[in-house]
Amino acid sequence: MSSTPFTIAPSIPTELDGFRVEIDVARERADVVLDRPPFNIISMPQRDQLRVTFEALDADDRIRVIVLRANGEHFSSGGEIKGFLDASPEHVARLAWNIAAPARCGKPVIAANRGYCFGVGFEISLACDFRLASETCLYALPEQRLGQIPGSGGSARLQKMVGITRTKDIVMRSRRISGKQAYDWGVATACVADDKLEGEIDALVEELRGFSSLAQRTAKKLLNDTEDASLSTAIELEGHCYSRLRTSDDFREGVDAFQQKRKPNFRGS
């Protein structure tokens, strides 16, 4: 007798190492909060748990937007140094995959950055869709000071954003850049006063909730998938995605709402 294959949805680990998860069903929002004060150092086991958590939140239909933030005045000063030496080769091989979890989410992910945002803290922020930085924020990939290089996708993602010259300046000199500099270079989505950061995050969450979740997922996947594509390939894929969305309920609702001069009621289908 054959059985029908099925997939078990991932679940958030019951005992979290160095972070917590807050879910606000009414606002369709989940917050992943780094919580190992004062510097919110990220351990090796924590990286695995963060990946599983993002996968679980992505599969949770109650959630529309995910926010990655931290407790205290620093987002994260980076990884646990001892963990680098103790980690198995198999664990090290998963570093970039774990930290890329926000990018693989179909839902929009926002990073709220303040204070130190170094090493893996910077790398996981780079994997998010939006980086809102406070004026206190300092970004850095300081691995050269340890005789190493970034190992979780930081230099690769940064080079795509700012080019090889600025990436060498940041990586090879272990240079710190401010939130304002990151905004000017296109690394940060916005740079705001520190006491305005939470308000800006809240406003962005509400803005994103107002769009079709289907259109949001489609746009994110298209942009991620075409990052390394030629212009002609990217245009072709964009056309395919556009054509598919033309048959969606949300597109019809959006057109009707526009013509009727009312707010659309998107349902994600």
Stretches found by the model and what they are:
Residues S2-L34, R175-R209, R217-T226, G254, ...:
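Amphipathic alpha-helical segments at domain termini/boundaries
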Residues R47-Q49, R62, R69-R104, C117, ...:
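Glycine- (often His-adjacent) and acidic-residue-rich active-site loop
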Residues V92-I99, V205, L223, I235-E238, ...:
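Hydrophobic alpha-helical core bundles mediating ligand binding, dimerization, or RNAP-core interactions
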